[in-house]
Swiss-Prot record:
Active-site feature positions: Y209, H389
Glycosylation sites noted in the Swiss-Prot or TrEMBL record: N236, N250, N404, N476
Binding-site list for Cu cation B: H389, H391, M464
Gene name in the database record: MOXD2P
Enzyme class: oxidoreductase
The family this protein is said to belong to: Belongs to the copper type II ascorbate-dependent monooxygenase family.
Protein name: Putative DBH-like monooxygenase protein 2
Superkingdom of origin: Eukaryota
Species of the source: Homo sapiens (Human)
């Protein structure tokens, strides 16, 4: 058969893998999982050993044909690193480390670096379980890194190995996660509360920022929010760009109803302290066991919900009731958590030239005035998590910590940032920031597909350069942003700066 020329074949009995299996094949102990396609046909489980630099995958596909899984890049599937396998009608299995030489054609690697751990087929599923090193010496193997990784999954209806667009899927995943939810405590008295907009008619405009005041859960004593997640209306996932919850002082007089966040009513724009949030591709996030968001005390602020809608198809008659779901408990954590927004001030002169292979924006935060701004002595802050944010031209971000003119560390980074995967991530270890430290945010953009200037702004086709640091203990500092020298920028552009 032609398959014998394409695959390395193994006798079924030599592998000790029965053809008939239960739904999931061999018992899986892999901690992480998600579907890779909109129809939930392809299900991936994975886990890894950081010390050994080995990662294991289990791909389960609703097919009796071949299955494949691997790593690809941002721009083309050609060159993708793909491990393929299946079970032939005679009971033999095939398994091979390959790469794409054309959009639909695979070629076997000279070095076989994937190890088969199990391959089964039943009346419904084909399940392939294998491991591979993070890195190999094979030029056709793409690395598994601590950045966002674009994975490719494909399958056939039979054992004829050829890729078809309708059965090939690419998804961005942060594979090397630091914490798994099973590692964290779940309080027995958990209460769920939804912070949501209600039956909001999304305007037919490209960009809308809708804000509304949110009454907090009514509790008689202090509680802690320990987890949050986006609550999206089905079919509106691609229209909701981000959801943020901001804090407003208890003395704030907040409007009722839903209004433009940055429009005529200044009350909304005065609420700038980010509490929790989610953006494109974001999922649930649980705080470390010793920190939580405080609610139920006289000092706790009022909240505003902000939803950014990107309706670039100008669809009429679309209603939305999206928001943020929070989980809270009376079991108090040791620390109240907070969020520090860093980056480049978006308005009015953040700009990126067209046709740029690489363009950098920098936002510098100097913390020596933090105690003065806080209005009280401020202890060192401990950073445990972060959220990266640019729009479509963003390619990479990082936050770097300096002390006394010396670089201490890169707090967080992603050299393969994807706008479609913006999620809160944990740091491998907590980072201490002292007053006087300098925090530099670096954003890398690419605009090869644009023929006009890209300006900073609220629309998805505008740009931003932001990193949100999750930290404790709580203080009164909400943001620390870099702001360019307007006179210098105007001079470089050959323009005259106005007041």
């Amino acid at each position: 058969m032609a398959h014998d020329l394409l695959f390395r074949l193994f006798p079924l009995l030599a592998l000790g893998v029965p053809l008939q299996s239960n739904r999931l094949g061999p018992t899986s102990r892999l901690r992480y999982s998600r579907f890779l396609d909109p129809s939930n046909v392809i299900f991936l489980r994975w886990d890894f050993d950081l010390e050994a630099e080995i990662i294991s995958f289990e791909l389960q596909v609703r097919t009796a044909g071949w299955v494949g899984f691997g790593v690809t890049n941002r721009y083309t599937n050609v060159g993708s690193d793909l491990v393929v396998g299946g079970v032939l009608p005679n009971g033999n299995v095939y398994f091979s480390d390959q790469h794409l030489v054309e959009e639909d054609t695979l070629k076997e690697d000279g070095s076989q670096d994937a190890e088969l751990l199990g391959l089964t087929e039943d009346a419904v599923y084909t399940t392939m379980h294998f491991s591979r090193p993070f890195r190999s010496c094979d030029p056709h193997d793409l690395d598994i890194t601590s950045n966002t990784v674009r994975v490719l999954a494909a399958y056939g209806l039979d054992d004829t190995l050829k890729l078809y667009r309708e059965r090939t899927f690419v998804k961005s995943i942060f594979l090397l996660q630091v914490v798994h939810p099973d590692d964290l405590d779940v309080p027995e008295d958990t209460i769920i509360h939804d912070l949501e907009i209600t039956n909001f008619l999304i305007p037919e405009d490209d960009t809308t920022y809708a804000c509304t005041f949110l009454p907090l859960p009514i509790v008689s004593e202090k509680h802690h929010i320990y987890k949050f997640e986006p609550k999206l209306v089905y079919h509106n996932e691609t229209t909701v760009h981000h959801i943020l919850v901001y804090a407003c002082g208890n003395a704030s007089v907040l409007p009722t109803g839903i209004s433009d966040c940055y429009g005529a009513d200044p009350a909304f724009s005065l609420c700038s302290q980010v509490i929790v949030g989610s953006a494109v591709g974001g999922t649930s996030y649980q705080f470390p066991d010793d920190v939580g968001v405080s609610i139920g005390t006289p000092l706790d602020p009022q909240w505003i919900l902000e939803i950014h809608y990107s309706n670039f198809n100008n669809l009429p008659g679309v209603y939305d009731s999206s928001g943020i779901r929070v989980y809270y408990t009376s079991q108090l954590c040791k620390y109240d958590t907070d969020v520090l927004q860093l980056g480049f001030f978006t308005f009015p002169i953040h700009f990126i030239p067209p046709g740029a292979e690489s363009f950098m924006s920098y936002g510098l935060c100097r913390t020596e005035k933090f105690e003065e701004m806080n209005g009280a002595p401020m202890p060192d802050i401990q950073v445990y998590g972060y959220l990266l944010h640019t729009h479509l031209a963003g390619r990479a971000l990082q936050a770097v910590q300096y002390r006394n003119g010396t670089q201490l560390r890169k707090i967080c980074k992603d050299d393969s940032y994807d706008f479609n995967l913006q999620e809160t991530r944990d740091l491998p270890s907590r980072v201490e920031i002292k007053p006087g430290d300098e925090l530099l945010v670096e954003c890398h953009y690419q605009t090869l597909d644009r023929d006009s200037m890209t300006f900073g702004g609220p629309s998805t086709i505008n740009e931003m350069c932001l990193i949100f640091l999750f930290y404790y203990p709580q203080n009164n500092i909400s943001s620390c942003m870099g702001y360019p020298d307007i006179i210098y920028v105007a001079h470089e552009l050959g323009e005259e700066a106005s007041e």
